[in-house]
């Protein structure tokens, strides 16, 4: 006969165990299946298109010119990894598959190497950030997370193999600017730990030079926007809400979107502050770890306060900085912990992990919410509209007949990966524009009224009979004194993703010629 108490003790023991067992592969398989489902149903938005377009539509010189001049506001590691896939002519979906591979590799490393209770590792894998934001939406962030976890797993060997450590830090620096503060903290901590050896041990000189020079290079790239870039010279006015929102979002995404947000948002904020306090308390005798977390948080808070207020994908790195620092911070010997009371090292760590676990449990509803949205609704209307344009070409040979697609909004780049060989004409540039080069002119064009777009196009082409207007919103009145504007297709009903990317395709019909049948 089963002893309930014994069964309960076994369940608790299994839940708190920090080892990796063969049975954990089942959870990894479930994680991979869910992420794969999300990737399959996801419609990429304009930001996801940028790395692919930069890799596809530039030669090698142009590619590195765009990266070094920071046009995409991300370092070039992710873009560089895309190059062979793009140049081999593989489909756009390859980018999402690659990101899914990064997610699965990061999940395996976390499950196998992270020194956390099993239940916490499971909850982390199925958090909103790991299950959706970074794994399904393809940006450079998942690559940065994978490198963070590789560094965490390697961290205990940093003194034995400093060159490999320097290579990993360099890759992290070039993965994304969002982790610059964390990488800088890791470099500073390494220097602090080896301060007495640096002058004597030449073996450290090369690795240190690699890390410091790459940090300086990435910092220079990040701050060196071309004057024609649409974000050049932009600064945020100080707003304390940018900081409080970032902390709340880091530990409880969508806290500001629910019915009881007036209660949940402050709870998420103060819960996040308490977690940060407890983590610092738990590391108070480990100065390198304090330096690493402090550097990352200081950098992120500076960015969110003065440069870019960020969104979930940015705020999540506060949460990830905490996870990373807890991972690499070794527990003191049992004898040293003996007799300690709150807020002692082990207790503070345990309480912080417990509160984090509570947030993760409460956040499971976010997974259901976003996956339900992905299944029933489009994240962006770009894929649907691109399919409609391809169908027009297939049925009516519009591009062979000399038709031109006019697009004024920068988010039109979201369609371009699906339309190889097709270029959009921009009324502000007066030419076929590379929509992945976000100039002030291109950004200003997005603010034009739809009638100004039509007017500029008419001035350039004269006859509009072979023009297709790609708008981000419907025309208020679909006619003027010369043309009736036939709505050929509308894409994006129910769009729920970033920027709510909807697209409307119009074909001008000269009034004197009557109205031919609809193309679609």
Region roles according to the model:
Residues 20-48, 209-225, 301-302, 364:
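Transmembrane signal-anchor helices characteristic of membrane glycosylation enzymes that use polyprenol
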Residues 26-27, 207-212, 334-368:
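Signature aromatic-anchored transmembrane alpha helix within multi-pass, membrane-resident enzymes
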Residues 33-35, 130-132, 149-151, 162-188, ...:
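Membrane-interface alpha helices of multi-pass inner-membrane proteins
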Residues 51-56, 61-97, 101:
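Short hydrophobic/aromatic helix or loop-helix immediately within or flanking a transmembrane segment
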Residues 97-122, 276-279:
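Transmembrane-helix motifs of polytopic, lipid-linked glycan transferases
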Residues 136-142:
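Short acidic/glycine- and proline-prone juxtamembrane loop motifs at membrane-interface regions
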Residues 361-416, 422-430, 520:
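Membrane-embedded, lumen/periplasm-facing catalytic core of multi-pass transferases
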Residues 394-401, 407, 421-520:
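Luminal/periplasmic acceptor-recognition loop/helix of membrane-associated glycosyltransferases
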């Amino acid at each position: 006969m089963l002893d309930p108490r014994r069964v309960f003790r076994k369940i608790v023991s299994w839940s708190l165990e920090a080892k990796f067992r063969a049975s954990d592969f089942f959870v990894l398989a479930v994680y991979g299946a869910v992420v794969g489902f999300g990737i399959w149903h996801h419609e990429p938005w304009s930001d996801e298109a940028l790395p692919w377009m930069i890799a596809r539509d530039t030669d090698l010189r142009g590619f590195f010119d765009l990266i070094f001049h920071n046009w995409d506001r991300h370092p070039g590691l992710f873009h560089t990894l895309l190059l062979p896939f793009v140049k081999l002519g593989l489909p756009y979906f390859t980018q999402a598959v690659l990101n899914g591979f990064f997610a699965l590799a990061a999940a395996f490393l976390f499950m196998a190497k992270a020194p956390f209770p099993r239940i916490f590792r499971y909850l982390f894998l199925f958090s909103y950030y790991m299950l959706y934001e970074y794994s399904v939406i393809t940006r450079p962030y998942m690559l940065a997370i994978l490198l963070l976890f590789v560094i965490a797993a390697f961290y205990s060997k940093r003194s034995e193999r400093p060159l490999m450590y320097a290579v990993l830090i360099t890759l992290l620096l070039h993965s994304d600017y969002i982790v610059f503060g964390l990488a800088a903290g890791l470099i500073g901590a390494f220097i602090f730990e080896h301060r007495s050896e640096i002058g004597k041990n030449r073996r450290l000189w090369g690795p240190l030079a690699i890390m410091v020079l790459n940090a300086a290079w990435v910092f220079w790239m990040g701050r060196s926007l071309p004057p024609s870039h649409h974000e050049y010279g932009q600064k945020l006015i100080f707003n304390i809400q940018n900081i409080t929102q970032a902390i709340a979002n880091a530990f409880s995404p969508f806290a500001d979107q629910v019915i009881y947000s007036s209660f949940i948002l402050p709870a998420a904020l103060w819960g996040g502050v308490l977690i940060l306090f407890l983590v610092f308390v738990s590391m108070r005798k480990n100065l390198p770890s304090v330096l690493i977390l402090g550097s990352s948080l200081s950098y992120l808070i500076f960015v969110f306060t003065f440069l870019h207020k960020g969104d979930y994908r940015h705020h999540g790195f506060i949460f990830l900085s905490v996870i990373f620092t807890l991972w690499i911070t070794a527990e003191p010997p049992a004898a040293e912990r003996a007799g300690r009371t709150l807020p002692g090292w082990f207790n503070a760590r345990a309480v912080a992990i417990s509160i984090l676990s509570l947030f993760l449990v409460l956040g499971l509803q976010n997974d259901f919410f976003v996956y339900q949205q992905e299944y029933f609704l489009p994240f962006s209307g770009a894929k649907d509209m691109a399919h409609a344009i391809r169908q027009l070409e297939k049925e009516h040979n519009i591009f062979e007949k000399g038709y031109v697609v006019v697009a004024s909004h920068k988010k039109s780049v979201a369609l371009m990966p699906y339309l190889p060989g097709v270029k959009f004409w921009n009324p502000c540039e007066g030419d076929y524009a590379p929509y992945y080069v976000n100039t002030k002119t291109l950004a200003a064009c997005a603010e034009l009224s739809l009638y100004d777009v039509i007017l500029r196009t008419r001035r350039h082409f004269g006859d509009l009979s072979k023009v297709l207007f790609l708008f981000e919103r419907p025309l208020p009145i679909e006619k003027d004194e010369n043309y009736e504007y036939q709505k050929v297709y509308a894409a994006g009903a129910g769009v729920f993703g970033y920027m709510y990317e909807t697209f409307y395709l119009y074909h001008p019909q000269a009034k004197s010629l009557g109205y031919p049948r609809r193309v679609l």
